[in-house]
Amino acid sequence: MLRYGQFCPVAKAAEIIADRWTPLIVRELCFGPCAFGDLLFAMPLISRTMLAQRLKEMADAEVISIVPKAQGRGNLYRLTPAGEDFRPIIEQMSAWGQRWTQSIAPEELDPVLLMFGARRQIDLAALPAGRTVIRFEFRGVPKAKAKQRYWWLVIQRPETEVCLKNPGFEVDAVVTADLATFTRLVLGYVGLREVLGRRLVAFSGSEAAIALLCRLLQLPQQPTQKTFRFSSGFAAAVAAPKRSAATARIAAVA
């Protein structure tokens, strides 16, 4: 942990929150307790050694607590009250980033982050009765992630499910899109009117299913600064997807 050698509260807080990877760890824990593997999955560029070091530092600073899993081996990491107080900081960082850092480099495109990130912004209370299945077909996927071109979003109470393999349900609508464009659309950097007009994104299938998707993902008609939620009351209460069997299958082909 970097020390600034000052009693200034800004310096003291920065010693804890401003280290590399720490804000992203806090971001994930804002959605609920995570296992070590969950955090690795959410941040594929972090090494196991670095993650272990950051978690130890955060525990020493009493920003997180470490508790054994109720079932199975391993621990869960969760925010303490001190860590919870970082939540509005993460929200403000998100708002600042949306306003001032809208460029996305090709190497930053990530279908996994896009799909699970979009999923966890869905308000579970807004899910309708019945099941709706949306298939996504992305163009412009980086070669290293070519196996992540096709996705299915299963919208059904009590929560939504993101699948990299066909779940076997009848598809109600299909989204065909350039990956970079759809990423910018989900972030609010571009609007539906523009991307549909330029045929960078196309919808087909049930109009009701398409309308539901646009509403749940809050896809804007015009560019707008969206408010992203960092709480466990939404579909990503498990943060960066929990390492379920489905998640393990995704990791296996990534």
Which sequence ranges carry the predicted segments?
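N-terminal helix-turn-helix DNA-binding core of bacterial DNA-binding proteins
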Residues: 8-46
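Short, hydrophobic-biased segments on the C-terminal half of alpha helices
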Residues: 55-56
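Amphipathic alpha-helical dimerization/coiled-coil segments
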Residues: 88-135, 207, 224-229, 235
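C-terminal interaction segments
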Residues: 168-254
